[in-house]
Amino acid sequence: VSGVVIDCSVAAAWLLGEDDAAESLIAVGAEGGIHVPALWHLELANVLLVALKRKRLTAAEARTAERLAAALPVATDSAPPPLGILFALGREYDLTAYDAAYLELALRLDLPLATFDAALARAARKAGATIAGD
């Protein structure tokens, strides 16, 4: 397996035009494959809904962002990791279950993790994962 595990913070920054690094990370992932846990789709939909509700995006911009997200060459890991693994990672590295899912996928696939979440990046480094862009 090649590519990168991308969390919602990177995809959201790319879709909302908030960070130039996000575009680079998305491009890197598109070359080798973007891997995400199933919850990524829920988180990203929520980001777009909140941005629309807070008027950071117009309805047309939100539809465009949704189409861009849907067009990403994303490989979704359909089976969530066992609860015990998420719980153990969350406890050991002080993560939410959501962030633990990204870390677990990066560790299991032995792929770098792309994130703008400082706490998740710190935890991933402690767990032995590589951070994309480091």
Language model features with spans:
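Short, well-structured N-terminal submotif of metal-dependent ribonuclease cores
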Residues: 1-39, 51-64, 127
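Acidic, PIN/NYN-like endoribonuclease modules and their adjacent C-terminal/linker elements
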Residues: 1-3, 103-134
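Active-site-proximal, substrate-binding regions of enzyme catalytic domains
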Residues: 45-73, 85
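Hydrophobic packing residues within well-ordered alpha-helices of enzyme cores
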Residues: 24-25, 44, 86, 124
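Active-site neighborhoods of divalent-metal-dependent phosphate/nucleic-acid chemistry enzymes
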Residues: 71-119
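Alpha-helix N-cap/helix-start and coil->helix boundary motif
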Residues: 41-45, 83, 120-121
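Alpha-helix capping/helix-boundary segments
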Residues: 10-11, 40, 102, 119-120
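Aromatic- and histidine-enriched alpha-helix N-cap/loop-to-helix transition segments
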Residues: 39-42, 98
